[in-house]
């Protein structure tokens, strides 16, 4: 009997061992339900961080584009300032040049020859200075009237001339490089 008692007592131990194995098998099921919840929370955090990263990147790209546009714009403005820096001074000098041209239209006599020669030298120096800065007179007589370059003061009818043609220049116009600083005052054929 002792052997039977030993056998019966050993059986429950095996059952407990089996139960223990089953008990340990149930715990992973609880962990499995916790893991998807943790993964869902982690995925939400990852999605939020990804969205923040994308927004920050887009903001950075926009700021970089704005900065590049700013650099280009300021460079163009500096170039324009450099190109036309002398425009104000030239505009102030044009009436003096007009007066020199009127003085040179006076009839030369023995008495005023030296004065006219002096005026001519100063006038040439002024013209050279203007040319060195990129100032050119606007072509007028015989040219087709261009409202961007010419200011029509008078109109005449001449059958020998083409219509809309500049007949006479009344006051010289000037351009600084590609910009008109004073349009030419002209008489135009109808």
From Swiss-Prot:
Keyword Cytoplasm: yes
A Pfam match: GrpE
Location of the protein in the cell: Cytoplasm
GO biological process: protein folding
Residue ranges, annotated region (Disordered): 1-42
UniProt KW keywords: Chaperone, Cytoplasm, Stress response
Disulfide bonds: none
Positions with biased composition (Acidic residues): 26-42
GO cellular component: cytoplasm
GO molecular function: adenyl-nucleotide exchange factor activity; protein homodimerization activity; protein-folding chaperone binding; unfolded protein binding
Record-stated family: Belongs to the GrpE family.
Oligomeric and partner information: Homodimer.
Protein name in the entry: Protein GrpE
């Amino acid at each position: 009997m002792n052997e039977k008692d030993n056998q019966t007592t050993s059986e429950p131990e095996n059952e407990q061992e089996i139960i223990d194995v089953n008990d340990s098998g149930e715990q992973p099921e609880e962990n499995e339900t916790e893991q998807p919840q943790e993964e869902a929370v982690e995925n939400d955090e990852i999605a939020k961080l990804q969205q923040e990263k994308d927004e920050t990147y887009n903001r950075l790209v926009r700021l970089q584009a704005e900065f590049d546009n700013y650099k280009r714009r300021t460079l163009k403005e500096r170039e324009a300032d450099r190109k036309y820096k002398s425009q104000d001074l030239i505009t102030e000098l044009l009436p003096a040049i007009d007066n020199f041209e009127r003085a040179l239209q006076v009839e030369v006599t023995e008495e005023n020859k030296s004065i006219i020669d002096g005026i001519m030298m100063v006038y040439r120096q002024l013209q050279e200075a203007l040319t060195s800065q990129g100032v050119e007179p606007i072509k007028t007589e015989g040219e087709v009237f261009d409202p961007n370059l010419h200011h029509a003061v008078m109109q005449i009818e001449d059958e020998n001339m083409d219509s809309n043609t500049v007949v006479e220049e009344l006051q010289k116009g000037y351009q600084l490089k590609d910009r008109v600083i004073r349009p030419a005052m002209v008489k135009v054929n109808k």
